[in-house]
Amino acid sequence: EKRESPWGTTQLEQKKGLEFDEKEYDLIDKFSKEQNIEWFASAWDVKSLEFLDKYKLKNQKIASAMITNEEFISEVAKRKIHTYISTGMSNPENIEKAVRIFRNEKCSFTLMHSVSTYPTKEKDLNLINIIKLREKYQTEVGYSGHEAAPGPSIFAAALGASCIERHITLDRSMYGSDQSASLERQGLLILVDTVRKLPIIIGNERTGIYEFELPIADKLRYWQ
């Protein structure tokens, strides 16, 4: 298939232009260790999975495209590394099979509610699935968002998503199919800052008048 890209006019040329080689993964690994960051990646085949083994990662991820490949996800589960399983483009049966494989292998996992369109329209996000998946499988459920703004990811966290995954970019106008579904720096800062404040914003189940409300009540309720 012919296509125009900064790296050439074929799919293969674009793939080669975008993919990291081993040296670049080594740099990611080195930098992440220096910054005390636990990095990980999504393998899309067994060879790539074996390549990632050398880094002794503590987490791994199954992309939405791979959730129906039972042979592959069995290989992932056998590694006994905590795995984030994206559920885009899948039906309940697909998710059920993946969960069964991981539980049979006694491999811990987090389901990631996701909708695989780029960017995803707000009307298609269906964030209620975060609650439904958590109730059905009694496991942690996160959110892998592809919308253009930070708001829905904040709502996902408020619904109890245990983790948030987002694509990030320096500039959404840059070339690439994922750019329009990514957050720029300011959007990422808003997302992170607000999610960290959520426990304070949501609060607790306390009811009654706050002490700091009393002076206002005295001022406004003249009949007291």
Task: Indicate where each model-derived feature is located.
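Catalytic cores and adjacent flexible loops of soluble metabolic enzymes
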Residues: 1-224
